[in-house]
């Protein structure tokens, strides 16, 4: 992750298997104010040990799903990021 520009602190919420692997329901991370979803995902996977579910994760920024990993995300201080693995059940 390239953090040459401005950096902000965002709140990260983990759900289901991502919560188990990260060993926490929530955390904070410093991220650039502009980053691709793919770069962000790689950073979170590395920082929180999510490699085993990386290809199945869904990210949501301020309660809006990120549909395309090539999308650029613009963060402001205190934004919220959710890390959501697919849920199963019946």
Curated annotation (Swiss-Prot):
Gene Ontology molecular function, alphabetical: molybdopterin synthase activity; nucleotide binding
CC annotations in GO: cytosol; molybdopterin adenylyltransferase complex; molybdopterin synthase complex
UniProt xrefs under InterPro entries: Beta-grasp_dom_sf (IPR012675), MOCS2A (IPR044672), MOCS2A_euk (IPR028887), Mopterin_synth/thiamin_S_b (IPR016155), ThiS/MoaD-like (IPR003749)
UniProtKB keywords: Cytoplasm, Molybdenum cofactor biosynthesis, Nucleotide-binding, Phosphoprotein
Predominant place of localization: cytoplasm
Membrane spanning stretches: none
Cystine residue pairs: none
Entry keyword annotation includes Iron: no
Entries under SUPFAM superfamilies matching the protein: MoaD/ThiS
Pathway in which this enzyme or protein is active: Cofactor biosynthesis; molybdopterin biosynthesis
Modified residues (Glycyl adenylate): 90
GO biological process, one term: Mo-molybdopterin cofactor biosynthetic process
Localisation per UniProt entry: Cytoplasm
PTM annotation (1-thioglycine): residues: 90
Posttranslational mods: C-terminal thiocarboxylation occurs in 2 steps, it is first acyl-adenylated (-COAMP) via the hesA/moeB/thiF part of MOCS3, then thiocarboxylated (-COSH) via the rhodanese domain of MOCS3.
Quaternary assembly: Heterotetramer; composed of 2 small (Mocs2A) and 2 large (Mocs2B) subunits.
Extra information: This protein is produced by a bicistronic gene which also produces the large subunit (Mocs2B).
Function: Acts as a sulfur carrier required for molybdopterin biosynthesis. Component of the molybdopterin synthase complex that catalyzes the conversion of precursor Z into molybdopterin by mediating the incorporation of 2 sulfur atoms into precursor Z to generate a dithiolene group. In the complex, serves as sulfur donor by being thiocarboxylated (-COSH) at its C-terminus by MOCS3. After interaction with Mocs2B, the sulfur is then transferred to precursor Z to form molybdopterin.
Protein family according to the UniProt entry: Belongs to the MoaD family. MOCS2A subfamily.
Protein name: Molybdopterin synthase sulfur carrier subunit
Species in which this protein is naturally found: Drosophila sechellia
């Amino acid at each position: 992750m390239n953090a040459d520009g401005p950096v902000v602190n965002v709140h990260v919420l983990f759900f289901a298997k991502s919560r188990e692997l990260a060993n926490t329901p929530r955390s904070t991370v410093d991220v650039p104010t502009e980053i691709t979803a793919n770069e962000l995902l790689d950073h979170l996977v590395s920082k929180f040990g999510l490699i085993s579910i990386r290809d199945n994760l869904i990210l949501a920024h301020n309660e809006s799903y990120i549909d395309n990993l090539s999308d650029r995300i613009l963060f402001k201080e205190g934004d919220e990021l959710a890390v959501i693995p697919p849920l199963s059940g019946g």
